From Swiss-Prot:
Amino acid composition bias (Low complexity), ranges on this chain: 181-201
Protein name: DASH complex subunit DUO1
Subunit relationships: Component of the DASH complex consisting of ASK1, DAD1, DAD2, DAD3, DAD4, DAM1, DUO1, HSK3, SPC19 and SPC34, with a stoichiometry of one copy of each subunit per complex. Multiple DASH complexes oligomerize to form a ring that encircles spindle microtubules and organizes the rod-like NDC80 complexes of the outer kinetochore. DASH complex oligomerization strengthens microtubule attachments. On cytoplasmic microtubules, DASH complexes appear to form patches instead of rings. Within the complex, DAM1 and DUO1 may form the microtubule connections.
Protein source organism: Kluyveromyces lactis (strain ATCC 8585 / CBS 2359 / DSM 70799 / NBRC 1267 / NRRL Y-1140 / WM37)
GO CC term, one of those recorded: microtubule
Keyword Coiled coil: yes
C-alpha cells in the first residue's frame, strides 16, 4: 500500500474544506458554501470555545444526577431563560455591529444630517446622478475625435493640373501621341515612307 504523507500546510487547507462540505450536506443555510467562508483560524477559535463549554456541561451532568424531580423542572426553566437571554444578546450584538458600520458610512451620516425624508433624499441623489451623466455625455462629445471626409481626386474649379485624355501618352515616356500616329498613317496612305535609319537614307529605286 502507498502511504500518503501530509504536511501541516496541506492539512490546514483540507480541514476548512471538510467542514464546509459537511455543513452543505446537512443543509445548513447559515454559512456560505464557498471555500473562503471558513478558515483554519476561525476553527481554532471555535475549538477554544468548545473546550471551555465542555467542562461546564460535565459539571452540570454531575449535579443533575443528585437532583430531585422538582429541581429538574427548575433547571429546565433556568436553561430556557438562559437560552432566551443568549439569543437576545446575539441579536443585540449583530445589530450593534450593523449600527457601527452605518455610523462609519459617510453617505448615511449625510442623510441623517440633511434632515430630509427618505424619498426626498433618494430623489436628490437621483438628480445628482442625472446631472453627472449629462456632464459625462457633454465631455465625451467635446473630446470625440473628428472624422474628416476623404479627399476627392476630381479637379474642381480653376484647377490647372493637366488631365491626360484617354489614348494619349505622356511625352516624357518616349511614346507617340494620337496626333503623331495619325500623321504617320496619312503619310503611308499618300505613298510616302517615313525617313529610315542607317543605309536606307537617301537611296532611290532604279528600274531596268
Amino acid at each position: 500500500m502507498v502511504e500518503h504523507k501530509l504536511d501541516a500546510s496541506t492539512i490546514s487547507k483540507m480541514i476548512p474544506q471538510i467542514f464546509d462540505q459537511m455543513r452543505r450536506q446537512t443543509g445548513s443555510k447559515n454559512f456560505a458554501s464557498t471555500p473562503a467562508s471558513i478558515s483554519t483560524q476561525s476553527l481554532l477559535k471555535e475549538q477554544e470555545q468548545l473546550d471551555k463549554i465542555i467542562p461546564v456541561i460535565q459539571n452540570l451532568n454531575e449535579r443533575i444526577k443528585d437532583c430531585k424531580e422538582g429541581d429538574m423542572e427548575r433547571i429546565k426553566e433556568t436553561c430556557h431563560a438562559m437560552n432566551t437571554i443568549l439569543d437576545k444578546f446575539i441579536s443585540i450584538q449583530s445589530q450593534a455591529s450593523y449600527v457601527n458600520s452605518m455610523m462609519n458610512n459617510e453617505e448615511y451620516l449625510d442623510y441623517v444630517a440633511s434632515g430630509k425624508s427618505e424619498e426626498e433624499y433618494i430623489s436628490a441623489k437621483q438628480r445628482e446622478v442625472e446631472e453627472l451623466e449629462k456632464r459625462v455625455k457633454q465631455y465625451t462629445t467635446m473630446h470625440a475625435p473628428s472624422v474628416k471626409p476623404p479627399a476627392s481626386k476630381i479637379p474642381v474649379g480653376n484647377d490647372t493640373r493637366k488631365v491626360t485624355k484617354p489614348g494619349q501618352r505622356n511625352g516624357r515616356s518616349g511614346l507617340y501621341s494620337i496626333s503623331t500616329r495619325n500623321n504617320s498613317n496619312n503619310s503611308g496612305a499618300n505613298g510616302r515612307r517615313p525617313p529610315g535609319n542607317g543605309n536606307n537614307v537617301g537611296r532611290r529605286r532604279v528600274y531596268r
